[in-house]
Amino acid sequence: MTKNYMDRQVLAVLKINLQHQFGWNEIQYGHLVFAFQTAYALGMLVVGRFIDRLGTRVGYAVTIGFWSLASIAHGFMNSLGGFLVARFALGFGESGVFPASLKAVAEWFPKKERALATGIFNAGTNVGAALTPLLVPFIFARWGWRGCFFAVGALGFIGLALWLWLYRPPEQHAQCSTEELQHIRSDVTESSGKFSVGEILRHRQTWAFVSGKFLIDPIWWFYLFWMPDFLERRHGLSLRQIGLPILVIYVLADFGSVGGGWLSSFLLHRGKTVNLARKTALLVCAICVVPIIFASRVSSVWAAVLLVGLAAAAHQGFSTNLLTLPSDMFPARVVASVAGLGGAAGAVGGMLIAEVVAHILQWTGSYTIPFLIAGSAYLLALAVMQLLVPKLEAVRIAIPPTA
């Protein structure tokens, strides 16, 4: 998770430098974000089934290798068209990250522990987002912008080796005892057989998850791809100066990721229902996002950083509980497919926000409207999810009869 976010954020950190290098305007930069999101959405439509069929270990390994090569490819590009191709490839490769991660959580943890486990792995995204603006300025000073893409991309192959060395499903892991395996399977109600995407789409639970992802994921993409620019444009920080504020934002986001998972897991251990535990955590996080509407109006850079950091923490807490819903409501064998559909919806939302933010900045030069959108998205998402699924319940996927 950490490496995945490092790859996608290098472009955001180098945004102003690359705009000076190639003469890109805000709309052209928005097209680069749009290309990534388009490929991410398309990948999500197929990668979940790919990982469900190939298995978590091998499926994730393939995606790591693919996106690392795509990240390195940025360093060879000399035009907007070349960068569009590289961003598209990176987005397609990285679309496998969350479906594979959620499937791994479903394989290794019982339902009561999944939100906290999801929060911990989701915290890795914030580590990557925080490290990138600290590392990239030093690489840039020594080897230029191409060296930034080469160096960060090459790290992926270290992650690939570690993944293949360390990960096994619990049934195949030498250190997983019979008692631990029974604990993992303590709340499994599993059926076997083939399934279709059409069968998954018949359920309101699917659409609740998809709607939530469509509405909140674009806000995270906005933070990821435009916060360095916001700090440079609104508060006059240099490439070297943005590192510490970005670090603070994503450290706070880490606390939110783990804290959001802890809150719902705590409520479950206190005997609350899955429905009450997850939705309580979602509501608390949605409320905590609202103050970000003032981020563009404060004159102090650190006041703005704290407002964005609170919103980022709340987003991650919300996202942690949202990402747990597929494993709460669906059999483990379809979790990656459901997660893929949600990820595709989130990426489509990201495509829209890329063009909206780019045009707003080109026309107004102000972040006021994007922050207003960010502050309202989570309460809207929770309201839509509540309308679709007033009570979270497990889904049984029908299996076609066999001859």
Enumerate the language-model features and the residues they cover.
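Extracytoplasmic gate region of multi-pass secondary transporters
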Residues: 11-12, 204-260, 314-327, 350, ...
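Cytoplasmic helix-loop-helix junction between adjacent transmembrane helices
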Residues: 86-126
